Each structure stands twice: as C-alpha cells, then as structure tokens.
C-alpha cells in the first residue's frame, strides 16, 4: 500500500466488463446456478447497474476456487465497475467483507487479496473516509488473522496520515486505533500499546474500558517505566483514587511506598487485574534508578540498595544487572568496593530539583572542557615558539656559511 494517487485503466465498456466478470463467475465449478450472466443482462437492459453490483457482491465469494494468478485481474474489473457508483462507500464495505470470506475459504489467496485491497485503497478518493476505514480494517484483519504481520508492519506509521487525509471523524479514528491495538498485540506489543495510547488521547470526556486497559498494560508491562505521559491524561485523571495513587508511586515513589499501598489495596489490584508481583519487581528497578540519580559523586553503595529494597546485600548485583538491562542505569560494578560507579541514570520525574542538578552537571562539564582546552593549547604554543627559534638558528647558519 502506497497511499498515493493511482489510476486503474480498464480498456472496455461497462457492459463488456460486466459480461467478462459474469462469465468468469458462471464458469467456476462451485457456481451450480450458472445464472450470473443472464441476471446481469436483465439488469443492464433496464439500466440497473446498482443491482448488477449487488449481485456480484453476493457471488464474489465463489472466487475462493479461482487460481491465484487469475484472482487479481478479475477483481480489478469489479474495482473499476464500482468507481462511479453512487453507493461507492457501501459497495467498498461489502466488497471488503466478500474478500475476507474468500480468504476464510482459501487462505492461500490472502496475499493476492491484500494486493487487491492495495489497488482498491489507492484508487479510492481520499475524501471517502468510510471506504478507507473499511479497506484498512480488512487489511489489518487479514494480515493478523493469517500471520502476515510483516506485510502490515511497515504501513502502520502511515495510518494516522491516511485517515487524516480522508477526514475520518475523531470517534471513528479512535475506534479504529483500539481495533488495531487489539489485532496486533500478539505480534508487536509496543506498537499495540502506542495505538491504544493515541486512542485514549483522542477523547478526554470519560474513563472508558480503553483507558483502563491502557493503565493495566502500562502498570503490568515489564518494559514500561515512565508514566508521566499517562498520568497527566484527563481521562486517566478520572479514574478512582487508588489507581491514581499507584500511578503516582510508579512515577516517583519508592519500594516502601508500594508495599504500603498494596497492603491496603489488594482487592483493588485483583479487581483491576494489576499484577502485584510484576509491579513489585518494577518498583525495585525504579527505586534503584532513583537512588542512582541521587547518589553522591555518582557512586551507589550496595548497602544503600539493599536497605531500600529490603534484600540481602548478596542479591544486590543481580538487581543492578537487571536495572542496567532495562536501560534505566548505565555503570560499572565493583565487587571489591561493593559499589556501582554510575555513568548514566534515568530521571523518572523531571522537576525543579532535576533541572537544578542538570544545571550543576553542565556547569561542571563546561569547566572541565575549558580546563582541557587550556591544557591542549599550552603544548601547541610551546611548539610554535620552539619551531620559530629553531628556524631562526637555521637561517643564521645558512647566512654564515654563505
């Protein structure tokens, strides 16, 4: 799918195209009635093209028996027929349903059907919003149903622009994002979460099921650590106080805060399907990250980690390895001094204190750079003076010899 302007050219009249498609359907072994051509001629005689198209739509699933190499050309004929239809968007919707039925009956034809959907998408006028929604919905359905996600993945980033070009309403766009999120979750959890997050951002009016699912997935995910972009969303702020307290702890609290919270909210966790063990593990990693940002001289002792996590000091290295793997901290461990030398740490909340700390680090860095520049310039100046003196001596020697 390209999303660019596309012109489909079929060099024949409407009547010839109708007869070609009707004869093809009648010749299929699965079509026992063999009456498509006769009915089409009857409808054409009364200039009832709409009934011709409706008839084709009911018989297109017969193409499940067609050879793969013939499917795309014959369906291109139907695409051309519906281009000038007054009920174009309705016909596209039913056409997409028929294509899904063909794939369900013969999933070997799915790649060819996706190619047909691509042609249909590129020939559909951008402003026909419901047509684009129908086509993209079928593309997502077929690629995820028949394990062809690799075909879909490169196009996901274009979905917002394509729907915006078509003028799709906010409510329809939101519903589509939720649909995509569910469809692709087993293939790409990160992309799925991104579509759900965008859906939640589109409606500030209520905390519906999508909002609760977003929070649940973020809280339980072993890879999601920064909650600022979720906590501030208006629909999330409408959730019950217990959930907001948990999000606040995940944003800037420590392990002790979570232990206290979960002791009072065990039933709430079960009701909201929050994974207490997964959150406890996440809080330990986040606690280490916070300790790392506050460590004096960028050195964190194992003892401080053990104290904050309420664990034996012998377990600290394993947790530090996990927090480094999670990308929250970078550093070097020393078994001799039982410390972590911190090279980089992630701030969970970036407020006034963090801005002050950043300013101090940048000032220190600037001072170090100025000192290094002075050190580097000093030998260069000495070398220039020495070279000048040597040149003068050589010149004098030449003059004397002459």
Swiss-Prot record:
Cellular component per GO? cytoplasm; cytosol; eukaryotic 43S preinitiation complex; eukaryotic 48S preinitiation complex; eukaryotic translation initiation factor 3 complex; eukaryotic translation initiation factor 3 complex, eIF3m
GO MF terms, alphabetically ordered:
translation initiation factor activity
Q: Which PANTHER family match?
A: COP9 SIGNALOSOME COMPLEX SUBUNIT 7/DENDRITIC CELL PROTEIN GA17, EUKARYOTIC TRANSLATION INITIATION FACTOR 3 SUBUNIT M
Q: List the disulfide bonds.
A: none
Looking up Pfam families in the UniProt record yields: eIF3m_C_helix, PCI
Where would I find the PCI domain in this sequence?
188-347
- What SMART domains does the database record attribute to this sequence? PINT
- Family statement drawn from the similarity comment of this UniProt entry: Belongs to the eIF-3 subunit M family.
Q: Which GO terms describe its biological process?
A: cytoplasmic translational initiation; formation of cytoplasmic translation initiation complex
Keywords carried by this UniProt record: Cytoplasm, Initiation factor, Protein biosynthesis
Assembly notes: Component of the eukaryotic translation initiation factor 3 (eIF-3) complex. The eIF-3 complex appears to include tif32/eif3a, SPAC25G10.08/eif3b, tif33/eif3c, SPBC4C3.07/eif3f, tif35/eif3g and sum1/eif3i. This set of common subunits may also associate exclusively with either moe1/eif3d and int6/eif3e, or with SPAC821.05/eif3h and SPAC1751.03/eif3m. The eIF-3 complex may also include SPAC3A12.13c/eif3j.
HAMAP family, alphabetized: eIF3m
The protein, known as: Eukaryotic translation initiation factor 3 subunit M
Annotated function: Component of the eukaryotic translation initiation factor 3 (eIF-3) complex, which is involved in protein synthesis of a specialized repertoire of mRNAs and, together with other initiation factors, stimulates binding of mRNA and methionyl-tRNAi to the 40S ribosome. The eIF-3 complex specifically targets and initiates translation of a subset of mRNAs involved in cell proliferation.
Main subcellular localization, coarse class?
cytoplasm
Q: Which superkingdom?
A: Eukaryota
What is the gene name?
A: eif3m
Annotated compartments = Cytoplasm
- Tell me the organism's taxonomic lineage: Eukaryota, Fungi, Dikarya, Ascomycota, Taphrinomycotina
> Which organism does this record belong to?
Schizosaccharomyces pombe (strain 972 / ATCC 24843)
């Amino acid at each position: 799918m390209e999303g660019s302007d596309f012109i489909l050219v079929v060099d024949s009249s409407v009547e010839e195209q109708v007869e070609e498609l009707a004869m093809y359907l009648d010749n299929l072994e699965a079509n026992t009635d063999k009456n498509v051509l006769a009915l089409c001629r009857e409808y054409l005689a009364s200039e009832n093209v709409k009934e011709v198209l409706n008839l084709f739509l009911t018989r297109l699933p017969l193409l499940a028996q067609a050879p793969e190499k013939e499917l795309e050309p014959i369906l291109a004929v139907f695409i051309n027929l519906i281009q000038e239809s007054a009920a174009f968007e309705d016909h596209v919707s039913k056409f997409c349903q028929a294509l899904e039925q063909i794939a369900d009956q013969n999933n070997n034809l799915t790649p060819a059907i996706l190619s047909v959907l691509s042609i249909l998408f590129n020939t559909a006028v951008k402003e026909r919003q419901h047509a684009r929604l129908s086509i993209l919905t079928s593309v997502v359905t077929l690629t995820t149903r028949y394990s062809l996600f690799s075909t879909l993945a490169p196009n996901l980033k274009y979905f917002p622009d394509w729907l915006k070009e078509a003028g799709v309403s906010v409510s329809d766009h939101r519903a589509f994002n939720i649909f995509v999120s569910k469809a692709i979750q087993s293939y790409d959890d990160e992309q799925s979460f991104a579509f759900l997050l965008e859906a939640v951002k589109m409606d500030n009016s209520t905390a519906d099921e999508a909002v609760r699912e977003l929070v649940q997935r973020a809280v339980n995910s072993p890879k999601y650590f920064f909650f600022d972009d979720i906590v501030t969303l208006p629909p999330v702020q409408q959730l019950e106080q217990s959930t907001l307290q948990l999000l606040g702890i995940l944003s800037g609290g420590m392990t002790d805060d979570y232990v206290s919270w979960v002791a009072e909210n065990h039933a709430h966790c079960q009701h909201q399907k929050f994974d207490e063990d997964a959150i406890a593990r996440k809080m330990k990693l986040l606690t280490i990250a916070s300790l790392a940002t506050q460590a004096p001289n960028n050195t964190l002792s194992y003892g401080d980690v053990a104290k904050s996590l309420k664990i034996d000091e012998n377990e600290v290295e394993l947790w530090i390895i996990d927090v480094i793997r999670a990308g929250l901290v970078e550093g070097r461990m020393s078994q001799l001094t039982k410390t972590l030398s911190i090279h980089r740490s992630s701030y969970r909340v970036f407020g006034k204190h963090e801005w002050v700390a950043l300013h101090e680090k940048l000032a220190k860095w600037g001072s170090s750079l100025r000192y290094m520049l002075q050190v580097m310039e000093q030998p260069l100046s000495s070398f220039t003076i020495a070279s000048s003196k040597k040149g003068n001596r050589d010149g004098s020697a030449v003059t004397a010899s002459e």
